[in-house]
Amino acid sequence: MMGIGVAELNRLVDRMMASFVGVGAVSILNYASKINTVFASCLDQTVSVAAFPTMSEFSAKKDYTQLSKLINLCLSAYLLILTPITIYIALYNDVIVSLAFGRGKFTIDNITLTGQVLFLFALGLIFMPLRSIATNLYYSLGDTKTPSYNSMIGMVVNIGLNVILGYYLGVKGLALATSISYAVITILLLANLKKFSNWISVEYFYRNLYKPLLGGVFLLISFLLVKHIFAFDVFLCSFMSFILSLAIYILVLVLTKTKEIIYIINFLKCKLYGKDCNS
């Protein structure tokens, strides 16, 4: 509960700081935050919420081998999914904002600035679900203090960076401060897992970090190539970039024998056809 309270307080602080950095900054921050939250919430609901009961079950049975496998799977799956999303937002943030809010009194300048803020929020997007999984792991192990303390540290970091970066970068600095605070919380949570090192191991996750990063490199290259080819139409370019680059990304993951991508594909098939994924 404390962690939720800290998150709400963080958002309140962001809005308060935004009111001091420029005209319309609060609205810009809210628009960008809404889009960013859509991506984060979808993943959080589909993976974290589904995994938490199983985490609790393994913890209650003290089956730490299976618990470690589940944690590694969740962390790796999150990273595989979030890598293309983050790169896509980085390259097409203005298109996303234009599709979502580009009407009425929302000007080109508003779209550009909101897109830049969205990009800086997206830098922290990759840490938000990882933090959620790590937090659920602590809760399943009966440790509620560590996530709360780390959230409080993140809040202090966020407030401090809001003041510094907000002064120099305006509303963009507030978004960057939020992303950095998410990164700090996540890194601390994963680092503090060493207290459970006799039971929980996330070495598999660390050893296989190169796979989504390698896929991300090919994804970025394909994004840039498609962006150049379809430069005559921004919206067609963004659509084709997503489809073709995602196909290349998945191909790279399959070629590197990334088992999480097979799990994700099977999971989606189960959901699509209404089958029991555990059978």
Predicted regions and their residues:
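Alpha-helical transmembrane segments
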Residues: 134-142, 190-207
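Membrane-interface junctions at transmembrane-helix termini in multi-pass inner-membrane proteins
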Residues: 123-153, 164, 168
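Helix-loop junctions and terminal segments of transmembrane helices
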Residues: 45-63, 68-74, 134-135
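Interfacial segments at transmembrane-helix termini and the short loops linking adjacent helices
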Residues: 90-124
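Transmembrane helical elements of multi-pass membrane transporters/channels
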Residues: 1-57, 219
